[in-house]
Amino acid sequence: MAVLRKLNPSQRRGKILGSRAGYKLGWSYGQRLGRSEVVVRSNVPFVSKACDLSVLCVTSGMGLPFSPIDHAVIEALKKQVRELHICSPKDDLVKLTSQLRPQLVLVLFGMHVTTEVVNSVRSLGSTTAIWYSDDPYYSDITRLTAIHYDYVFTNELSCIEFYQLQGCRKVYHLPLAVDLNVFRPKRVDTGYFSDVCFIGSAYWHRVGFFNRIAPYLARRNVKIFGWWWERLEQYSKLSHNIRNEWLSPEETDKYYNGAKIVINLHRSPYDETFNKNSTRVKALSSNPRTFEICGSGAFQLTDARQDLPNLYGPGQELATYSSAEELIEKIEYYLHHEEERNDLALKGLQRTLRDHTFDHRVAVLLNVLVARR
């Protein structure tokens, strides 16, 4: 207490209150992490029967943000097929297929694999499949390439009919998922702590939305990461909370773990500046962050796409909003209802572990292919 006696009454009171606040924050965070770790330890890992298949997997060749998806799919395939070979779009895919004679050539994303190459691979007798992981944003391109594959898997529910109209007969909805080697509950330093966190690029739809909530967010401990946020009209209000940079998946997970609330706001499928979707295919399905936020054990507040109830229970495993006003209202509510917030986050984590890993998705893909052989 010697230090406290040297302070004036106001300083002493501030120091005591600060210590209490820090203790409360640390205790609260530790309790949440402990409960999350119990959920993870009690989860029964998904195990799928290995398929008697030889597979040649062609990565996206796109770098971030697609390379982590490549890695997660490959790791899941390693557990579930008899033989796996991996190549990039820069490799001679026709030559490799001729040499290896895989039963399946699985192309991820496929922007750098020409239709001529796909046709040549098919002529060699291998079954071809593509998993489009960023539909409907590249529909102007994918509508021309999909017909050349034997099987088409898409992350976007609305694209099933879209590809069928292009002449594809075997089209399946296959959502993305979480890589549990990256996104999971973990202890992080206090520098990662926040009341509210948002990670994502400043597409114009997001810019307009954040302009409306910026005055409110400026009063909170907020962290925002991503490209182009200087476009905000309200940038001056939030500049000290914004880092205009792309975060690695590992860093993203740390900020999710340190946040009380993580906002998810989907990009618009109609943004002509960035999209190649001139036919204006709707976006009904949830983005990868939906799974990653829940997989981190964080509390998610998301705008609700039509397919969300098929993946998570709104109000049970995460929370939703439909306007800027409702988002502010729910941020306030859940910041002041910690137990309810943490309960939803835990249930979201449980659901993710049970249903939404890349092991689950690859098992579905392989089951479709084996059943139709």
Model-inferred region functions:
Residues 1-49:
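Membrane-proximal basic amphipathic "stem/tether" segments
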Residues 36-169, 180-184:
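Extended catalytic core of nucleotide-activated donor transferases of GT-like folds
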Residues 83, 149-150, 168-172, 234-247, ...:
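Active-site regions of enzymes building and remodeling cell-envelope glycoconjugates
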Residues 93, 117, 142, 249-252, ...:
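Acidic, amphipathic alpha-helical patches
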Residues 177:
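Carbohydrate-associated surface elements
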Residues 188-261, 267, 271-274:
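Conserved catalytic-core segment of nucleotide-activated headgroup transferases in glycan assembly
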